[in-house]
Each structure stands twice: as structure tokens, then as C-alpha cells.
Amino acid sequence: MIQTQQIGPVKIFFGKLPYYPYCNTLLVKGRQTLLVDPACEEKALRRLAAEEKIDFLFNTHYHPDHIRYNPLFDGIDFLTHRDDAPCFRSLDSMAEWVGVKGTPYEQTWKDTLTKAFGFREKKEVKEVTDGTTLDLGGVTLQFLHFPGHTPGLTGFLIPEFEILFLADMELSPAGPWYHNKKASIQSIIDSVEKIRKIRAAISIPSHGQEIFRGDIGPRLDRYLENIYSRERKILEALSTPKTLDELASLSLISGFRLSREQVWFLFERNMIEKHLDRLLRGEKISKKGEAFQRRATE
């Protein structure tokens, strides 16, 4: 049986696992009820669907570990950020944004999403943007855009309770993740700085059972440091010339042993490529043919 915790108007259903393919699900209740990211665990969500009157379903972004049990709540007003909405309307769009479109991984990835995760395209999508408010009757949410992990990643603030939902800006030691084609390291950095300015007594992440209370500044610092630490590892690896695929094979970011047949190899490659772009722009590395190398001064 999964663990739950009530904080003010928010009930947290902690994910069956603290990582993919599950996430924390939130139920926010005023006179109306909002369900957030139904992906904690199937039995709990089937029970929730049978026992609760859900008025709104909100997905923080389009990743499978946040949408896997959406079909249990078909017919409910569906909300997501405008910038991620195309991925809910079209599986092909999602494949393109993830980066599998036109690759050997595409069909297997699509099969996994539709069969294992039950993905269905949604034609009726109510789009929110940064600052959009939702009045549940006695409880008001302010949606907050945290782009980077995906273009439309969105959490929210409940001002009267000083509760901040971080979504997948989850501040874990393993993050952040920018493994999709449409992800952006710089946008993640900017989102961290945005979060730093938000006044909240309680901050809830999408993964793990730790609820953050009070100042999360030091956690934000460590989260950013992970990005810069990865960059240093890449620079160290480029003491001798290496191609993008050779760097991806080292698993410098994920730490997983990956074969090129695994889609996670593509995701590792995507993340490494984003760092290489940053390092090239910063003139810390050079490129000759397909090989990259650290500049002599670095």
C-alpha cells in the first residue's frame, strides 16, 4: 500500500517507486478537486477514481511517468501548460520532442507509451500559462512555469498556505534531467533562479517522500552544482579527442551501463550534446571533424 501525507488542502500519494516509471500524485481539494499527475500506483488511483469526484486533471508535463494512468480519468477537464500541449494532442509530436522521431528507437518507444503506459491523444486540452490561477473554492492555485526539463514543465503555488509544488524540479541528487531533444540546460538554470525568489514554507517535489520545509536555497545550489559537475567531467574526458557517441558511451551523466540499443543511450547522448553546445559557445572546447577536445587553456 502506498504512503500518503496530508498538508493543508493537498494530499500527496507518494509514488510506488521514487523514480521512473512512477511519480507522486497530488489531490488538491477546495469545494472542487484537482488531481495532479496520476502516476503514483494503479490500485490507489483506481480507488481514487471510484471514490472521489474529480473536477480537473492537471499534468505538469508530458513524460510517461507523470501521465501513465491518465486514462482512468477520461472525460474530466484536462489542463497542462501551453508549451507542452502539442505532445498531449499528438504522439508524433511527443516523439519529435523526446528525440526518438526518425531513430531506430521510435517504434519501440511508441509501443511502450501506448501499451505499457496507455497513452491516448487528447483533443480537448485547456492550456495554462505562467501565472494562470485556478479557484477551487476556498483554495486558489497559481500555476508557475519552470521550463527546461520540458518546454512546458509547470508547478504551482498555493499562496494562502505557502505551499509550492516543484513538479520535476525535484532537487534530487540525481537531477536535473534534460534528456529530451526539447530540453534546455539554460532554461533549467533560469527556473532554479525563479524558484529561489518564491516565498514558500513547504515545497513538494514530484519524486521521493521528502517534503522540503523552509529555505530550499542550499538544495537549489546543489541542484545547479550537478550541472557544473557534469560539465567538468566532460572536460576531463576531453583531454583526448572524443566523438559525441564515444562520450555518451562513458555514461558520465546517468551513471548507467548503456548499450546503443537502449533508448537511454540516446537520452545520455542528448544530455552530453547540450553540454558540448555550451562548452563550444564558451570556447572551452574545440571541434575537428566529429571529434571534440578540451582547449589547452582549460
Predicted regions and their residues:
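C-terminal regulatory/interaction regions
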Residues: 233-298
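Short glycine/proline-enriched coil/turn segments at helix->beta-strand junctions
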Residues: 30-32, 50-54, 71-77, 159-162, ...
